Amino acid sequence: LHRLIRRQRQMCIRDSFSGAVTAAGGVDSTVNLGLSLIPAHFAVAGLFLIGCFISVSMGTSMGTIAALAPIAVGISEKTGFAPSICIGAVVCGAMFGDNLSMISDTTIAAVKTQGCEMKDKFKANFFIVLPAAIITVLIFWFATRNMNFHLEENVSYSLWEVLPYMVVLLGALIGINVFVVLISGIVISLIVGVSMGHIALSEMFQVVGNGVTSMYDITVISIIVACIVSLVKEHGGIQFILNLIKSKINGRRGAEFGIALLAFFVDACTANNTVAIVMTGPIAKEISEEFDVDPRRSASFLDMFTSVGQGIIPYGAQLLSAATLTGLTPLQIIPNLYYPLLMGVCGVLAIIFRPQSKKTTVK
């Protein structure tokens, strides 16, 4: 329960930052900054890269999809590309950051349940999924290389409004405590918002509170899930699952496959990768300790394979949101979701060709 409270407190601060930076105009400026950098022949691949940047900065796949879906529709209308491939690029980029961002609720849940540092998990995770991201860029570029796109709408941006995201991203990368980073981001967002005229002094607490209230549903669900997991553990359910998994695996490689499959299938059942990590985290922790799996890798595989599941199931929030915003069906978008599938392939290859490294100290 104490770990759950710490995790939810961190998520609430994350969403306070999200509320503050959105009100300060940070989302619009970040999107426009990315769009202004897209070469004309690189429109769809550029959507993927912008989605990666925004989702890593914002820590939310849903927010990324909401911000970029209208732009994807516009690019589709002006180039003749199928809207499914344009929104597919957005969803792929959103899932990249959902897995990697150090202020994502999935990352917070993964590192807290496995007992490792965020920056260590990021480094281990990043080098596993980097080939998937590069291949995805090449696929989108090759599929759309014969079309040009010229953005006619206003894409004005302010680097001051992007500053809070950069502070949070760089602060997290160099290893500053996540609470310090997020609180700094909130303060900078409020200063920028007030100075730019986006936030009135009387609205400062309101915009921060709006971010916190967005956490209500996931907080309640996480508490209920944690209680259920504790009851299951008390009555021997987790031990039963552990014994079942242990009987099927042998050594570290088998343990990592067990963690990956467990994470994927639980996400497929819950359709929520944060909830799936909260549920499978204690079991993955037991497996990693039993078979001496590096906690950085167990956290990475938990986060990766729940993201793989979340990125391809037609009833997941990300695909449902993308479909609603574009008037498509999830099944029309799924064939263009190259990144989640490639991330899964890279994860499997990372397990098969795992490096022989010493186990790190558990925090």
Which ranges hold each PLM region?
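Hydrophobic alpha-helical transmembrane segments of multi-pass integral membrane proteins
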Residues: 14-17, 39-71, 92, 245-285, ...
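Re-entrant/interfacial helical elements at transmembrane boundaries that shape
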Residues: 63-74, 91, 102-116, 240-242, ...
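Juxtamembrane and boundary regions of transmembrane helices in multi-pass small-molecule transporters
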Residues: 92-95, 99-156, 160, 170, ...
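Juxtamembrane helix-boundary/capping and inter-helix hinge elements in multi-pass membrane proteins
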Residues: 7, 80-84, 109-121, 234-237, ...
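Flexible hinge motifs at transmembrane-helix junctions and intramembrane kinks/re-entrant loops
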Residues: 163-195, 202, 356-357
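Single conserved hydrophobic/aromatic residue that forms the stacking wall/gate
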Residues: 1-13
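Membrane-interfacial loop-to-helix junctions in multi-pass transporters
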Residues: 6-7, 33-50, 76-86, 155-163, ...
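Transmembrane alpha-helix boundary signature
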Residues: 17-34, 59-62, 83, 199
